[in-house]
Amino acid sequence: MILHKGETLFLQGETGPLYHLRSGLLKIVRVHQDGSQILVNLIIPNEIIPHHSLISPNPYYGTAIALITCEVDVLPAATWYEELEDNPERYRAIALLLQDKLRMMQQRIDQVTEVTPAEKLRKLQAWFQAFISPATLTDVLTQDEIGQFLGLRRETINRLLRSQAGSK
């Protein structure tokens, strides 16, 4: 299946299949009762999501939205879980997938724990370039989302981006 920028793959609270992201980039947003949204995760190519449902089913934790054009394989839940039961060696493959995700999260923690806001932003921009070049970070995320992801205020992100533009 092809998803275009801004299209939704699944909604928070629903249940359904798992998905393999072949190409593109997805964001996972958590919607609160007041309607506000917070960016909680980014999904890169070759990930199978939702991560928390790789071994047993659970409702979707957030809403998945395409940041750029994505190619996605639908993995029917019943088939996925039956294959796990029939082939216990697949649990090792899932453990390796989750290990890779944890390592990526450690890299993101390194980005967020940088001392200066400017360095946090620079590292996030560099990480994104591997997936979205020639587009830029601000082509796919709002300043609010960048701030949420880095633990910074939108105003700080705006100031840093203006400073970068001025120094070029």
Residue ranges and their predicted role:
Residues 42, 74, 140:
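Short aromatic/basic micro-patch
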